[in-house]
């Protein structure tokens, strides 16, 4: 993985802006600590920060190829999982290769197929290709949205980057937010409306989108979306195909020129990945795999059982590690440091985020990076295969709202009267806009129609937030995390799978459990879904209280929006928040942590409300 950025403005000579271009590039150095590169051609500049994973010598970027009197230049962030097949296809068409990097395959695929190359790629990526002849720029983001690509268009020019901080470093993009941005932060956060970058004028290519910038105009195009199709496979075939698609995705993602490791939570998803990889290594005599898990200091003492998280993870982690014969290490996080890392997690996202769910992951990845550059993780199975409670509780399922954020009451309680009066309406409209796009079949039952809507909501909202979290918090330490459940072939198959098959045995992710039950311990295969762990230690809550009270004493733009009495009520009566205000576990400590992140974000980024 890497960091990419670029600036196209043919009214300027970019060679006169080298210092500014270098500053933009330097903001991405955590994404690519190994190498950096810069391409400048009068009105065009492309920047690259490289994390070396495959073909160190021949994968340097920006990479250029001359073909039929035209030079094409690429900056690429990601991993391709069908590199070998595409390379052979291109060789058969007369292309020659100087190395075995996927970057070269992507570039020559574009030369061969143009914009249709996107449909050839199986992987996680974002890239830009500059054509020196017609001075056009092609942008593309992977089908599922695992890798980010932001942009800012202005009169006569375009900026793009892996992260917003690089756009801000250009000085063209201002750290400004308007009412829409405030609604995003206060009523939708840590989620974002698809394509909306919160800062005024900043946008992001959606999953499965590409764009062409030519003659000072950007034209976006959807090259991929899930389609509603009839599921014709019977139960046995569905089980077999689910297993094949996921196993193939995992094995494709084991390719690396550097050592890789695995996240292990003791849940179904990471256990499938770990066991499949362990079996693959054993078959190919590649040795034991290395696994990591995260825990909080004294969490066994303070753990609080809930419907979302009925049991702690450590017993199941130990069981799975023994079953797969892994070299395992548990990373135990200090609760005060988890609070301290809230600030770095804002720097990683460029926005307030998942608070301690972010900061703990960031610390976890820092530790892993000391020994590894690549890891595999089990994200997104719940979104695809109905793992969350809101898929199974029909009372929640048919509520006409975002199921992970059903009420805005807690969010409203921290704001002064009259601030963002239309916040609830804003959220409602985003919800309606999304479900209206969900592809359906005329033959769908009411339940299947709603399940398609729920899949679509989770895919474009909840899942994107989790993928953003995983990308930013891991790449902040230069750790590449791969997500096999995000293979687009598996996504397509899951979208059209009837609910009675997906929920095989009337269980969340039942079809996945059934598909892999012969290789997993029964206790893990049929264990109730448990989310990413959070700290229950009162030290964390007390740290948040102390910092929030200090914030409330400041004179700041943020405090002109916040209601100190409402916040004090949360501090004094945290147990009144019985339902999460976002996701499954975010309650009183997390709303306080969100205020801490908001305060830091406004100050650190010099955010101006316009």
For every predicted segment, state its role:
Residues 1-348, 361, 517-518, 523:
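Cysteine-centered catalytic environments shared across enzyme families
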Residues 1-4, 22, 71, 116, ...:
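Adenosyl-5′-phosphate
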Residues 306-309, 345-347, 389-397, 610:
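Short secondary-structure boundary/capping segments
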Residues 349-354, 586:
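Long, Lys/Arg- and hydrophobic-enriched amphipathic alpha-helices
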Residues 369:
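Catalytic nucleotidyl-transfer cores of nucleotide-processing enzymes
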Residues 372-382, 386-388:
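Short acidic/histidine-rich active-site segments
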Residues 385-409:
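A mobile, often basic/glycine-rich helix-loop segment
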């Amino acid at each position: 993985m890497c960091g990419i950025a670029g600036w196209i403005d043919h009214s300027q000579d970019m060679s006169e802006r080298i210092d500014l271009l270098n500053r933009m590039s330097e903001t991405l150095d955590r994404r690519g600590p190994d190498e950096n590169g810069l391409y400048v051609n009068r009105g065009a500049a492309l920047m690259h920060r490289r994390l070396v994973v495959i073909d160190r010598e021949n994968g340097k970027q920006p990479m250029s190829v001359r073909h039929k009197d035209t030079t094409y230049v690429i900056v690429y962030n990601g991993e391709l999982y069908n590199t070998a097949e595409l390379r052979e296809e291109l060789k058969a068409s007369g292309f020659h290769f100087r190395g075995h990097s996927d970057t070269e395959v992507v570039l020559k695929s574009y030369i061969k197929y143009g914009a249709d190359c996107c449909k050839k790629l199986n992987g996680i990526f974002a890239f830009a290709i500059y054509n020196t002849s017609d001075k056009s720029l092609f942008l593309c983001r992977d089908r599922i949205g695992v890798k980010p690509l932001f942009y800012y268009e202005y009169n006569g020019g375009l900026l793009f980057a892996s992260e917003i901080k690089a756009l801000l470093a250009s000085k063209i993009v201002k750290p400004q937010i308007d009412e829409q941005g405030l609604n995003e932060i206060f009523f939708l956060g840590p989620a974002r409306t698809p394509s909306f970058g919160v800062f005024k004028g900043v946008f992001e290519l959606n999953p499965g989108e590409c764009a062409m910038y030519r003659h000072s105009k950007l034209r976006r195009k959807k090259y991929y979306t899930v389609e509603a199709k009839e599921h014709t496979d019977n139960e046995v075939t569905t089980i077999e195909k689910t297993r094949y698609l996921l196993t193939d995705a995992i094995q494709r993602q084991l390719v690396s020129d550097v050592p890789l490791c695995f996240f292990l939570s003791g849940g179904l998803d990471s256990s499938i990945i770990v066991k499949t990889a362990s079996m693959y290594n054993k078959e190919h005599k590649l040795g034991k795999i290395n696994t990591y898990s995260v825990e909080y200091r004294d969490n066994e003492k303070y753990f609080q059982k809930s419907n979302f998280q009925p049991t702690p993870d450590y017993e199941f982690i130990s069981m799975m590690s023994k079953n797969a014969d892994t070299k395992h290490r548990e990373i135990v996080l200090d609760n005060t440091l988890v609070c301290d890392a809230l600030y770095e997690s804002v720097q990683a996202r460029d926005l307030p985020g998942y608070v301690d769910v972010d900061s703990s992951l960031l610390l976890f990845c820092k530790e892993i990076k000391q020994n590894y550059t690549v890891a595999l993780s089990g994200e997104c199975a719940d979104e695809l295969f109905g793992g969350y409670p809101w898929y199974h509780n029909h009372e929640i399922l048919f509520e006409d709202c975002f199921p992970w954020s059903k009420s805005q009451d807690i969010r409203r309680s921290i704001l002064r009267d009259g601030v963002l009066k239309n916040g609830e309406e804003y959220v409602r409209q985003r919800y309606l806009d999304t479900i209206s796009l969900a592809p359906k079949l005329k033959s769908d039952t009411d339940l299947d129609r709603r399940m398609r809507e729920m899949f679509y909501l989770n895919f474009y909202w909840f899942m994107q937030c989790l993928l953003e979290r995983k990308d930013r918090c891991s790449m902040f330490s230069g750790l590449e995390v791969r997500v096999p459940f995000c293979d687009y072939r598996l996504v397509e198959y899951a979208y059209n799978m009837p609910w009675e098959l997906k929920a095989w045995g009337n269980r969340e992710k039942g079809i996945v459990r059934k598909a892999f039950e012969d290789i997993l311990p029964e206790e893990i295969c049929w264990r109730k879904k448990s989310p990413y762990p959070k700290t229950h230690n009162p030290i964390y809550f007390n740290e948040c209280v102390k910092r929030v009270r200090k914030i409330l004493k400041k004179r700041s733009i943020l405090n002109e929006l916040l209601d100190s009495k409402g916040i004090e009520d949360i501090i004094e009566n945290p147990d009144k928040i019985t339902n999460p205000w976002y996701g499954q576990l975010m309650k009183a400590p997390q709303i306080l942590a969100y205020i801490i992140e908001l305060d830091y974000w406004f100050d650190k980024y010099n955010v101006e409300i316009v």
